[in-house]
């Protein structure tokens, strides 16, 4: 399958395929935090992220969620549907943590009575600012119906993920999703789902996600390996 690099990101490289509607996503060993300010090469990270994300996307597909995932090609590669990415990071919070706690001056780990969905404008130059629905419309990123769909679909995905992670003894604190338009103009889930873009805490409150790297709490791959081993228990 011939391929040409079309995009190089912080965590993945994207390649063309012989089918104009398909791409190959190659997961890197690079770990970044604080919008790329903190950066490090960590051997084995790409393999673990690809394994975890492929597994989660397969389960989401089986549950009826429309995603870009087609199949896992190798340890670090997966085949995806080509999408036009919507320049929004859609964040859902089940508990207070991270920037939410800092922004509102509250402790981490407080359960939210109703999960909160937030939008962040995907723009590295602006440091991905927190925006609301009206900003999304002003920037002509999405209209009312599309905004409602993004929120509804994110909440539906959350209900699935919460159950799966609870089954393996992990609490889903929050996560970030990205969506895109497929060749037919339908909004589908894209990007990845791994400990890179979610927060997971075990029963003792230990971080099982990229906060280990952000906050210097231990070895990233050790934690990701534990998450991957636990997930395989869902099969």
Curated annotation (Swiss-Prot):
It comes from the Bacteria. GO terms for molecular function: ATP binding; phosphoribosylaminoimidazolesuccinocarboxamide synthase activity. SUPFAM superfamilies: SAICAR synthase-like (SSF56104). Its EC number is 6.3.2.6. It is an enzyme of class 6 (ligase). Keywords: ATP-binding, Ligase, Nucleotide-binding, Purine biosynthesis. It holds the Pfam family SAICAR_synt. It catalyses: 5-amino-1-(5-phospho-D-ribosyl)imidazole-4-carboxylate + L-aspartate + ATP = (2S)-2-[5-amino-1-(5-phospho-beta-D-ribosyl)imidazole-4-carboxamido]succinate + ADP + phosphate + 2 H(+). One of its GO terms (biological process) is cobalamin biosynthetic process. Signal peptide: none annotated. The keyword ATP-binding applies. Pathway: Purine metabolism; IMP biosynthesis via de novo pathway; 5-amino-1-(5-phospho-D-ribosyl)imidazole-4-carboxamide from 5-amino-1-(5-phospho-D-ribosyl)imidazole-4-carboxylate: step 1/2. InterPro entries: SAICAR_synt/ADE2_N, SAICAR_synt_PurC, SAICAR_synth, SAICAR_synthetase, SAICAR_synthetase_CS. PROSITE patterns: SAICAR_SYNTHETASE_1 (PS01057), SAICAR_SYNTHETASE_2 (PS01058). Belongs to the SAICAR synthetase family. NCBIfam families: purC (TIGR00081). HAMAP family: SAICAR_synth. This is Phosphoribosylaminoimidazole-succinocarboxamide synthase.
